[in-house]
Amino acid sequence: MNGMISRSLMGVFCSACFSVVNAQDRPNIVVFIVDDMGLMDTSVPFVTDYHGNAVKQPLNEWYRTPNMERLAKQGIRFSTFYAQSVSSPSRASIMTGQNAARHRTTNWIQPENNNRTPYGPLDWNWKGLTRNNLIYPYVLEQAGYKTIHVGKAHFGCIGSEGADPKNLGFDINIAGSAIGSPGSYYGENGYGVIKGAKSRAVPGLEQYFHTNTFLSDALTLEADKEIEKAVAEKRPFYLNMAHYAVHSPFETDKRFIGHYTDPKKNQQACAFATLIEGMDKSLGDLMDKLEELGIAENTLIIFLGDNGGDAPLGGAADYGSSAPFKGKKGSEYEGGVRVPFIVAWAHPDAENKFQKAFPVAQNAIQTQMGTVMDIYPTVLSVAGVKVPENHILDGSTLERMIAGKKDKAHRDDFLMHFPHEHRGSYFTSYRKGDWKLIYYYNPEHPDAPYYKLFNLSEDPYEKNDVAKAEQKKAKELFGLMVKRLEMEKALYPIDKDKNELRPFFIAK
């Protein structure tokens, strides 16, 4: 593995390099990522009232996620946790600790073709992650961890280094490739093997072909095997458990369809709900395996979705799939970027040395903002490994917040830069404290950009644009947004003559 990473990088983080260590010396870490799972796609309530108490919403009554409930009781969940609005940018941000504007994978990666979209930046990073990105699994590997990737990768296009997670710093890759969605969830269909068609088949799971093993279960079984091997080798492990669920196609997991019979919901919405419950079963099975192996108290689980929800319950700018929030995956609204985030020890034990070193509040809700960029430094903090020298981070550790405390030093802003066409097109959104500005570039009419402003403390569901009434605040946030874009060396949309469209402020 080491020879696959640029040798010139070794000196950059030699302070983090160790020989293989014993499992008793470092905790195990599982990052459990669910594709296209939004904040509301669960029975665990993340919406809070003014006092920070959870408030159940109708969608929380629709979904069944008992193992997420189990995990939440054992740990802390964040009511306000931000991801990028689509998958590839989020996954790159998780792996690098950098915002999409900086790593420049600002759109989802279409495996075969550059999906820059008509006015997208010419030099956006379609090829995705490379071995020079210093993703944190590689840093962990150098510190003696066994690093395991199971499931969706979507780190790069076909033929790129990022198409195979083993090129980036994982010892083991099972089922990860350039594809962003499975051809099928059914083993009977070979998880998408279609003769003569572009392959969306999930690789490496041939042993389950022609069986009734649902994809989420196949991935869980493979993860269990790798955990067992790491335990036998007496090595601490990092598991990137990255489900293809709940991305389309919305195929029914027949084991759970009896739970979703609301005649007001369409068939696809019911199928989506079964994918959610099947994913939740995987979480429970994994937690049970950790208990069975006697390593649960030494294993931290970080659970999250990779972008806003995509439930087939409404459009990109309404209050359907993410209700009461507006929008869904790919949109500029809160429903497009807010995701579930839970951190817990797999078996809480106040006397455990790892848990003493990294305490996690139990059955708690953290209302302070976190982002996917914070995962990189947080994971390394759990492992007791230093961030590589000269590696730029846009996030910071969530250690104090995970312990249930407030962290005044933690950033209270989030920049979401999407210079492409999608459900929400050519926009930058910027949240600072309670205020959120959405700036729209206008490639076909470059002199007529426009913007919206929301006060999320008074209007969390983005129903009232107050830009005209709050011009001073709009201009203030615009200035902070531009400063952040420049700091991260962002690329911008272009017009029909390929001129870069930099943001400028127009008073209303």
Where do the language-model regions lie?
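Bacterial Sec-dependent N-terminal signal peptides
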Residues: 1-25
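Active-site-proximal N-terminal segment of extracellular/periplasmic enzymes that hydrolyze or transfer
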Residues: 24-76, 153, 464-472
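Long, internal low-complexity/basic segments
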Residues: 24-27, 34, 39, 77, ...
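Loop/turn elements at helix/coil->beta-strand transitions in domains of secreted/extracellular proteins
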Residues: 25-30, 73-79, 142-148, 168-171, ...
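Short, structured active-site-proximal loop/turn typified by the sulfatase FGly-forming signature C/S-X-P-X-R
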Residues: 49-91, 97-99, 146-147, 168-177, ...
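Formylglycine-dependent
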Residues: 105-146, 153-237, 243-252, 264-273, ...
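C-terminal cap/loop subdomain of S1 sulfatases and analogous C-terminal strand-loop tails that border
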Residues: 172, 310-334, 344, 349-364, ...
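Metal-dependent active-site segment of extracytoplasmic phospho-/sulfohydrolases and closely related
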Residues: 236, 242-243, 278-317, 342
